[in-house]
């Protein structure tokens, strides 16, 4: 979804560069982000009932994880070369910032993934996808309001993942924002993020459909925290339902953003 946000109304059928970038974001970039995470979290993942499934990620054997880092590096190199040709030297700075964010999040002992609230704040690095998409496709960078929305969206999504992982994270001794403040406060925090996102989208973009979805999400998490699951862990069936719903909403969101370009141009608001 982030890759396509700067590209409202773009011609999908006749842009090889667009598809190249989309492929990179979906596979090699995902391989880097989640592959490194799998290596670092190998022990904790063995305690996580979500892992080892199609929806929630693989559970690699020790020998597979040992070879993974070299495969991750090998997959990045061709894209670094191609992007250098297409974009120029500035792509080197992009990769440096990307690798710095990955290192900050995953570093043993000092990694931000185990140091709240930095485990949440580092998710703003997903905004690098906005930048890459605009560079590759010759599109204008999104307005700052869209960057704020994107950062908060990435952060609330990460907290939700932490809520689903509270029990295995506690068993493994990992500290996260969710293990620190508990499930109920985490859900209310997600609702707070969603309320701010709702305000940003409505005030600056008048995106009524997106505003409605975000507002409903905020209402749902308050309801969940107060009346439904509260502090109880989600069942595997409920987590699968959430994930299928998340994927469906992402697909609809990508189509909507392409058809309307609703987040590419912000309205001027006096005093802001």
Question: Model regions: which residues?
Answer:
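Multi-pass alpha-helical membrane architecture of UbiA-family
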Residues: 1-272
């Amino acid at each position: 979804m982030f890759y396509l946000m700067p590209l409202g109304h773009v011609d999908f059928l006749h842009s090889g560069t667009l598809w190249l970038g989309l492929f990179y974001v979906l596979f090699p970039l995902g391989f880097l982000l989640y592959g490194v995470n799998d290596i670092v979290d190998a022990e904790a993942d063995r305690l996580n009932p979500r892992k080892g499934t199609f929806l929630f990620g693989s559970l690699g054997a020790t020998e597979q994880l040992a070879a993974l880092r070299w495969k991750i590096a090998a997959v990045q190199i061709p894209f670094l070369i191609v992007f250098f040709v297409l974009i120029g030297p500035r792509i080197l700075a992009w990769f440096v910032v990307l690798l710095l964010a990955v290192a900050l999040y995953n570093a043993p002992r000092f990694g931000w993934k185990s140091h709240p609230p930095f485990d949440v704040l580092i998710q703003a690095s997903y905004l690098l996808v906005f930048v890459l998409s605009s560079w590759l496709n010759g599109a204008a960078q999104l307005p700052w309001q869209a960057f704020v929305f994107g950062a908060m969206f990435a952060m609330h999504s990460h907290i939700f993942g932490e809520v689903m992982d509270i029990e295995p994270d506690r068993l493994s001794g990992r500290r996260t924002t969710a293990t620190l403040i508990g499930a109920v406060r985490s859900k209310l925090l997600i609702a707070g993020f969603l309320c701010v996102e709702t305000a940003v989208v409505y005030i600056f973009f008048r995106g009524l459909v997106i505003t409605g979805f975000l507002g409903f999400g905020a209402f749902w998490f308050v309801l969940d925290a107060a009346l439904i699951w509260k502090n109880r862990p989600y069942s595997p069936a409920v987590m699968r339902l959430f994930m299928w719903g998340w994927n469906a909403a992402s697909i609809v969101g990508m189509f909507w953003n392409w058809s309307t370009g609703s987040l590419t141009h912000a309205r001027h608001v006096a005093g802001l």
